[in-house]
């Protein structure tokens, strides 16, 4: 009887968890379409600014921090985009693992990485381990707004534009999860600054002419000067790229949460079925034992009467 009571208790608690998992899955399912659309809708704007920056970078004669790497400054900024909430499978752990790998590689190269973290789970992880963090942000990782992108981009741009002797950094990396589809989300490391010129794909045969740098992007006329345009467009470029990373990370987080809750719901239902079979087997064994005892008692009475 004690075994049956324990099984009933486990079935009841598992059924309660199954309802929670199923509700979380349905909530994530209702959010994923919007999160995916928001990320896709932001891409054209980001691509347009990226093309403009590429056109500026194509002017190889310019001397601007956006394209010039300070080899004398070993400090490097690394921004990790984690989540505020759990129940999203390996989402945050994958980001932290890739971030730790990047930090180790930078250390091997003789650089001094400075860590910035977005998301309560990541902040808690590094705080618990007493790891130094240069900047943290929390809130709405599954629905990030423009305000948080502005705050992050301002802090990172300030760090990048500072002189080396004032604690500035020479490079900026972002570790985030790129949304591919509902099943696939890839952890990526993006070096945002300094900007490198991306040339169009060339045929395998024949040399690459120098004029191809001018063909990397559409033609632009810059007024009053390339440097002044760079100064004006740099904050918008950083903010738009960070905002795009936040949005695709939010879509990835929601998809990961839906997949995790779907798996948890299936596992809970399988466990309920297994526990129910054990309970039924225990009941059947109890009934069989009781019948055996009754029949044995009846036989004993009959023998006494004889």
Swiss-Prot record:
It is a peripheral membrane protein. One of its GO terms (biological process) is proton motive force-driven plasma membrane ATP synthesis. Pfam families: ATP-synt (PF00231). It is found in: Cell membrane. InterPro entries: ATP_synth_F1_ATPase_gsu, ATP_synth_F1_gsu. Keywords: ATP synthesis, Cell membrane, CF(1), Hydrogen ion transport, Ion transport, Membrane, Transport. GO terms for molecular function: ATP binding; proton-transporting ATP synthase activity, rotational mechanism. Produces ATP from ADP in the presence of a proton gradient across the membrane. The gamma chain is believed to be important in regulating ATPase activity and the flow of protons through the CF(0) complex. Belongs to the ATPase gamma chain family. F-type ATPases have 2 components, CF(1) - the catalytic core - and CF(0) - the membrane proton channel. CF(1) has five subunits: alpha(3), beta(3), gamma(1), delta(1), epsilon(1). CF(0) has three main subunits: a, b and c. This is ATP synthase gamma chain. The lineage of its organism: Bacteria, Bacillati, Actinomycetota, Actinomycetes, Bifidobacteriales.
């Amino acid at each position: 009887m004690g075994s049956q009571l324990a099984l009933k208790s486990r079935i009841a608690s598992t059924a309660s968890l199954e309802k929670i998992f199923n509700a979380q899955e349905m909530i994530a399912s209702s959010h994923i379409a919007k999160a995916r659309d928001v990320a896709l809708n932001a891409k054209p704007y980001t691509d347009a600014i990226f093309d403009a920056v590429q056109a500026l970078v194509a002017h190889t004669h310019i001397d601007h921090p956006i394209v010039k790497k300070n080899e004398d400054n070993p400090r490097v900024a690394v921004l990790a985009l984690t989540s505020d909430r759990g129940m999203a499978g390996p989402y945050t752990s994958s980001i932290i693992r890739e971030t730790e790998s990047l930090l180790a590689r930078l250390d091997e190269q003789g650089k001094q990485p400075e860590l910035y973290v977005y998301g309560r789970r990541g902040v808690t992880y590094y705080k618990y381990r007493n790891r130094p963090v240069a900047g943290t942000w929390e809130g709405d990782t599954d629905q990030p707004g423009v305000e948080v992108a502005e705050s992050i981009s301002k802090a990172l741009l300030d760090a990048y534009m500072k002189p080396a002797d004032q604690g500035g950094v020479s490079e900026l990396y972002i570790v985030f999860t790129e949304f591919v589809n509902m099943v696939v989300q890839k952890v990526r490391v993006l070096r945002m600054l300094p900007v490198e010129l991306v040339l169009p794909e060339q045929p395998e045969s024949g040399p690459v002419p120098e004029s191809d740098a001018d063909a990397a992007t559409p033609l632009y006329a810059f007024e009053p000067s390339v440097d002044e345009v760079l100064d004006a467009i740099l904050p918008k470029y950083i903010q738009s790229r960070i905002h795009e990373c936040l949005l695709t990370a939010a879509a990835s987080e929601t998809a990961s949460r839906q997949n995790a809750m779907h798996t948890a719901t299936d596992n809970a239902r399988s466990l309920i079925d297994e526990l129910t079979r054990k309970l039924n087997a225990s009941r059947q064994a109890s009934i069989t034992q009781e019948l055996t005892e009754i029949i044995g008692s009846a036989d004993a009475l009959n023998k006494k009467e004889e």
